[in-house]
Amino acid sequence: MNRPICLWMTSRSRSSLVSKIFANHGVWWGDTLKKSRGYDTYENQVIKKIQKDIIKPKSGTLPYLEELDLTEETQQRFHQSLKQHIEDTMAKNCEKWSMKTGVEYFNAWRGLNPYNIFIKREASAIAKSISEKRIGDYESAFHAANWRFEYMNRIQKEHGGVFINTDDIINGNYQGIREAMEYCGIDYNERAVESAITR
């Protein structure tokens, strides 16, 4: 199984846009279309279910503001299930594959040495979006977004990776995308970026 590209996200960060940009660059993401609040999520629904079935937090349900503490047995079972799904489903000529998921799941993926792509947006904008969509309240969403971004910073410091600010993409600044593609060993294509954006 090739090294995964993990698109680490928090809610309402425009992570589906980033996943679509990677898909437009030829990265396999599962081709399991699902709409959420009117947009395509570009999230592998099969892997999402595998992950949800195997990976559990110590308390509550994910997404949850804690670093996962997993047994070696759980990690091995998760990795074996991923490998089986990838081998059974992904085209043999496809070299790169991605998974878009909450950064809380990092410890489940860490042993696979993923390319770490951290998707960021202003925490206040995320909280406002969550509040306006009536998904949750502003204060809780703001706190959760900041916790996740701090966790992303710690992961990057220890394991490497690239941040992509989706506000920059919307405003026409693709530098973060360029750096992410270079980091993942993918040839950058600006047309693939532009075609993913709906303005």
Named regions from a protein language model:
Residues 1-2, 12, 92-94, 111-113:
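Short, well-ordered loop/turn elements at secondary-structure boundaries
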Residues 74-111:
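Glycine-rich phosphate-binding loop used to anchor ATP phosphates in small-molecule kinases
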Residues 33-35, 166, 192-193:
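Proline- and acidic/polar-enriched loop/turn elements at helix boundaries
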Residues 96-189:
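PAPS-dependent sulfotransferase catalytic domain
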Residues 1-81, 199:
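PAPS-dependent sulfotransferase catalytic core
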Residues 190-199:
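C-terminal accessory extensions appended to soluble enzyme cores
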